[in-house]
Amino acid sequence: MSDTPSHDHGHDHNHTHEHNNPDDPLYNPHGEHPYQPDSEDTPYEHHQVMAEAVGELLIEKGVVTADELRAMIELIDSKSPAEGTRVIARAWTDPQFKARVMENVNDAAEELGIDPGTIPIRAVENTKDVHNVIVCTLCSCYPRLLIGLPPDWYKSRSYRSRVVHEPRTVLKEFGTEISEEIEVRVHDSTADLRYLVIPKRPDGTEGMNEEDLAALVTRDSMIGVTTL
């Protein structure tokens, strides 16, 4: 994981990449959604080896027990995007809550009884002028306690390297067409800071309650690769 400062990118390269090579991590013979091999099909990466080593060291030094470490892993594995969708729905319907989300996601989430963890999470809002998308260029930093485990494609080398340099092309591969008049900003998550996209509220939802609004929000829209 990275401890370098986060940075945003508002540019893209105006060219497309065809993914016709079966060795490409985003290759999909059906041409629908980016395909990423199961992690079991690929060798352990450096951060995975380090994570196991750190876990073993913490147990050996008595900082945590194996049961405590296992319980934390199970807690993280049990999380789903549902927690994040509640935050988004409340932000759409309560301007004061939205202001608190924009100031401090962690504190705002706790108001709803959600434990977002201790790592700071910053909200970035999609508007008629700006579209945001999240990546972790070095590994897979991600607000797991708020929106669940990261999808395999988020961890893929192809997504991590390409979305920074050609965001519109990558978004198009998810079926997301962003007008040239809209600025695309790419936010690089780090070990010290995570991001949450607040999707643009769909038109025609003014009369919906929070529960129904939350059902409209998807994991991918909170990452920024799709819109609602």
Language-model features: where?
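Terminal, compositionally biased segments used for targeting/anchoring and flexible tails
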Residues: 2-228
